[in-house]
Amino acid sequence: MRINKIFILVSLIIFSLNKISATAQAPDYLIIEKDTLKLHCNPLETYFEKNPLPDNTFTTISTGLWRGYIAYFKIKNNKLIVDNIYKIRYYKDEQGNHKEELISIYNIAFKEIKDFECNFYNGVLICPRGELIEYVHMGYSSVYENYSLFEIKDGNYIKERHLSNQEFIDLKLKHFQKYRESDEYKTKLAETVDMLKESEKDFEKDFKDIRKENNKKRKQNKYLYEKEKEIEYRKSAEGFLFFFTTNNIKTIDITN
């Protein structure tokens, strides 16, 4: 979705330059029996990349919901299905108070298909549980006490595991280290570095003090400045991909 590129550009500027706080994102949800669990992943994004929603679906976009929708999922008969999907209407009541209203867009997204099956999805549904240990005002980077993971292959439920926060971080790190060896990662890293460079150029146009400081460093030693910037871009891009990438976790277990 085009809006995701905007979100990435904004987040990259924030992540690398650390001038202002980024925005935590409203999650999708997984309904398991009587529990409604937050999801630290968005299973429908790959579907909407190939089957985009109509341009007029969203009239307003919040910085806390760049994708524009909130989806609710269930595992029914061992299949991952969409229970409902909503957009948020923002309005003021008669007293001038800001209000929000969930409006279903299920029929817009999936027409008359009931219990839309996510047979395109391969990955792990990441559900934080328990107390919030560390709040991070960026994407799904906050750390929780525990995590429930549900492995899905071709839309089918495979297995689940329940981990402490340290066990989850260790698992995520192992997956990321393996992901770094892939051609996909190298491509995404290069794309992220390019977007970071593009974003910083735009950022410099709007902030004269930053532009002056960078120009001063360029004049002092252009070669050293460019080398340092390349290292900075790469580190920022790698950090961004580690914190924001969850779709590289395809299985709960990982082999060495």
Model-predicted segments: where are they?
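Mixed-charge (acidic/basic) macromolecular-recognition segments
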Residues: 144-229
